[in-house]
Amino acid sequence: MEAVLRQETGYPFEETVTVTVDFAHKRVRKASFPLYFRVPQWCSQAQVLVNGEAVEAPADNRVLRLEREWSRGDQVTLRFPMEVRSSRWYGGSAVIERGPLVYALKMEEKWEKKAFEPERQDQYGPYYHTVTTDDPWNYAFRLKDIGKENLASGFKVEVKEIGDAYPWNLENAPVSIKAKAVVLRNWEEYNGSTGPVAYYNEVGGDTGDEVWIELVPYGCTTLRITEFPVRR
């Protein structure tokens, strides 16, 4: 007996994974065997349905085991609720995550094609691209806004249909997160990149206006701010 499992999902952007059971041989209608599904470490409460009915699926080392007699066309629906969360990194900086993805500041990108010097083309090819932006990027999060109790209300998640377009770019990013931030007045460009900054400052006297910023999945960006300074 050879089972065939067809998976349909918008993961890692969407929460739901649907698996349909089939059999390679047309004469096989039913068979008993276990199915195993790994629950991601970030998911605190996975939900499982078989043919639309909720089932208890004991977790053993973050693995769900479903053993039963399966019929052709049975469907297992897994839902991994994706909550916005923050983690702390270098120097006390804050990183925003949702589900398995890390998020970065969305900035409009200006791509410019440039030619290498003739003597370098054998090694590097004929040309390269520079990517720049005119958008502001010097933002920080308020400490209170990235507290666990405020993440759900302060970070607005927008999910759009994935469709057939390639999702890993700014134009087609299926998920975005709107968040409140403050301008960090003394964080400036240095040598074509972000200048040095104190990632964590309890005083916070270097902040300016409060604004709304947009975050998109890290993999959709070329230019990115991912580790944000934190101010009280």
Give the location of each predicted region.
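Beta-strand-rich binding/interaction modules
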Residues: 29-50
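Residues at beta-strand starts and edge strands
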Residues: 15-17, 31-33, 74
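Solvent-exposed, conformationally flexible loop/turn segments
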Residues: 30, 61, 71-73
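Non-cytosolic beta-sheet module surface loops
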Residues: 9, 23-25, 38-41, 68
